[in-house]
């Protein structure tokens, strides 16, 4: 192999090893970062739903209670759980991969009843009152999913409808009956907010970023290799070829060649000086032999 080919081969091997190491580290970093961003997005959406629930309970419900038909007609819009769920469903128009549920062990609406894995989360919050959030992964029929969960505790406003059945609004009783959603206790963990998103969503983001990173690295390497090759050719290879060509002519007896012009003070210049001294010494020696 010629010098340029050897140099390129060395750079390609070094770049390949470096790329292998960088790809392993960067992929893991990008996957973790995408997962963290997904969880943060879920946390913001959950906070939005919780704010809607609090607003409904503290601001909207007291106003609706003053309307003339409130006592005769059940309005689901006055239920904080309902308002939070509707708000999140509206957010899902922009984030369709996210799902939200306010799961409860004893809900009024059977739709909100916790599944087994959701009940386990609620039980964990009950047994660990200092915990305010759980992040985990679980298997689903369509693949793994990341979930973010925060506890829901019964407030004084909740007990107006979910305490004793006798104290509940008649319109609620007529709509849902008395079998579910009663007997809650103040500050008791009665459910959990749960946001789920398929694991493939953050992984897809990470892998797209990873492919883009590899593309940029490859382009940068090729551009760097091209610049190095051009510099190596004009700074090292071309002067060496000229020296080799002149040395070949001199070795064949052509002593009419002029001296090389020395440019710079680098190693190539030193080789050129040495060649000139050798060439001049050879000319003197040949003249002495002729005499």
Region locations from a protein language model:
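Cytosolic-side ends of inner-membrane transmembrane helices, especially those
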Residues: 23-30, 220-237
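Extracytoplasmic ligand-binding sensor domains of the Cache superfamily
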Residues: 48-54, 58, 62-155
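Extreme N-terminal signal-anchor transmembrane helix of membrane signaling/transducer proteins, especially
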Residues: 1-28, 215-216
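HAMP signal relay modules and closely related sensory coiled-coil linkers
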Residues: 238-250, 257-280, 285-286
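Short, hydrophobic beta-strand elements of compact beta-sandwich sensory domains
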Residues: 148-150, 164-166, 184-203
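The canonical Cys-X-X-Cys-His
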Residues: 154-166, 171-177
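Membrane-interface helix-start motif
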Residues: 169-183, 199-216
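Juxtamembrane membrane-water interface segments immediately C-terminal to a transmembrane helix
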Residues: 25-50
């Amino acid at each position: 192999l010629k010098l340029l080919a050897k140099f390129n081969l060395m750079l390609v091997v070094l770049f390949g090893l470096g790329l292998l190491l960088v790809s392993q580290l960067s992929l893991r970093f990008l996957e973790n970062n995408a997962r963290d961003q997904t969880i943060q997005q879920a946390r913001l959406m959950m906070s939005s739903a919780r704010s809607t629930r609090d607003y409904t309970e503290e601001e909207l419900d007291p106003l609706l209670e003053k309307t003339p038909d409130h006592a005769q007609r059940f309005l689901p819009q006055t239920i904080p759980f309902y308002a939070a769920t509707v708000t999140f469903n509206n957010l899902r128009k922009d984030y369709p991969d996210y799902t939200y549920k306010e799961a409860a062990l004893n809900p009024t609406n059977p739709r909100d009843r916790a599944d087994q894995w959701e009940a386990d989360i609620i039980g964990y919050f009950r047994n660990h009152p200092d915990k305010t959030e759980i992040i985990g992964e679980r298997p689903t029929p369509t693949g793994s999913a990341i979930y973010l969960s925060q506890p829901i505790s019964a407030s004084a406003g909740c007990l107006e409808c979910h305490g004793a059945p006798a104290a509940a609004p008649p319109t609620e009783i007529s709509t849902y009956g008395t079998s579910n959603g009663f007997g809650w206790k103040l500050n008791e963990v009665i459910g959990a907010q749960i946001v789920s998103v398929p694991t493939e969503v953050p992984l897809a983001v990470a892998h797209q970023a990873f492919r883009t990173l590899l593309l940029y690295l490859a382009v940068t390497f090729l551009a760097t290799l091209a610049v190095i090759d051009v510099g190596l050719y004009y700074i090292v290879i071309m002067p060496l070829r000229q020296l080799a060509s002149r040395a070949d002519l001199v070795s064949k007896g052509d002593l009419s060649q002029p001296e090389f012009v020395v440019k710079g003070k680098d190693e190539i210049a030193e080789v050129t000086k040495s060649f000139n001294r050798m060439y001049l010494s050879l000319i003197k020696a040949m003249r002495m032999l002729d005499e």
